[in-house]
Amino acid sequence: MYMELYPDKIKGFISIDSAPLQKSYMTAMEIWLLERAEPLYKIYPWKALLGAGSRGCAETDYGQNLMRKMMMSYDSDPREYARLAGFGYRMLAEAIKADLPYRISCPALLICGERDKAGSAKSYNKKWHQREGLPLKWIKNAGHNSNTDQPDEVNRLIEKFFSEVDGKGVSG
């Protein structure tokens, strides 16, 4: 949203395991589900959600353990986790439904885990790359949280991107 409001202030854009906000990428059903994630999370048995959440977001033991640790901070109140996740998904749905152009008018890099299983993130990144011509780097042996599965590779790509943007003399 910041980029939409202040495009001249952006020096570069990196998306890690994310998705475009343009409505044209989403189906009506996907938006509908985003708006209703909270009640789904509330009826999902907590222990099952812990397993699905950690395995669904990461491929490595390290990445899965980080996700599980974060989720376990809500172990005493899983409904709070559902509220927080639901809020995030609703905000995402609102941004998509705003149907703004969300133009990326600066150097950009899309990063996505080759084994990303979170929603349609992997297919969104393929389409985003094809439609907008944005560079896309696939991270081997990585899921939706590719920066926790392969932090060295993700950091290398980020550092390379920054050095290329800085080397072009783009003012910020």
Question: Where are the regions a protein language model picked out?
Answer:
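Hydrophobic residues on the short alpha-helix immediately C-terminal to a glycine-rich phosphate/catalytic loop
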Residues: 2, 18, 157-161
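Flexible "cap/lid" loop of the alpha/beta hydrolase fold
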Residues: 4, 10-43
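Short, structured coil segments at secondary-structure junctions
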Residues: 9, 104, 130-132
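Active-site loop signature of alpha/beta-hydrolase-fold enzymes
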Residues: 21, 118, 145
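Conserved alpha/beta-hydrolase catalytic His-Asp/Glu region
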Residues: 24-26, 43-103
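Short aromatic-enriched loop/helix-cap "lid" or pocket-rim segments at secondary-structure transitions
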Residues: 24-29, 122-124, 149-151
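Conserved loop-alpha-helix segment in the C-terminal half of the alpha/beta-hydrolase fold
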Residues: 108-142
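Catalytic active-site module of serine/aspartate enzymes centered on a nucleophile-bearing elbow/loop
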Residues: 132-172
